[in-house]
Amino acid sequence: MARQRKKLLIVDGYNVLRSGSRYRQVTDPDYTDDTFNVARETLINDVINYAGRDWRAIIVFDGARNAFSTGEAETVGGVRIMFSPAGQSADKVIEKLAHDARERQVETLVVTSDATIQDTVFGFGVDRMSADGFSREVGMHYEDARLDETPKVAQKNTVASRIDPAVLAKLKAMRDGESEPHGR
């Protein structure tokens, strides 16, 4: 049986941070570098968890104004993270990634609320999701995972149910004022 190709998830990093409801703390005009870095790390972790085994994922951040940005990707938790090269916008990188994926007939989803990117990639036949839609999906993903870990049947856990039966017998005997438990 042939191995099924993974789908490609492309995330417009800064757009999602500024537009997704999960990351609203970044839109505060008084955000600090620390707050922004925490939000970026949260997004990266969210993409890692959302992508799981079904998606190959890449997050593209805009590095156009950074003279030192090379456009090289780094992999964290199976997700490729890149800043666009100096002088090139993240939008152009995302459009090229989406176009190339469709040329290879790879099912692709682009997460952005940027209307221009949405229109461009939709023209390539690529699926799209808004930043807020992604925020909701991630929230539901975490909620489903949390529910999967909860016991399905209510179970009463008492100290007596977890203690060695011989020790329990001795404790009962002491409680009842007996010097030795019955049966000895």
Q: Can you say where each PLM-predicted feature lies in the sequence?
A:
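Nuclease catalytic cores that cleave nucleic-acid phosphodiester bonds
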Residues: 2-11, 15-184
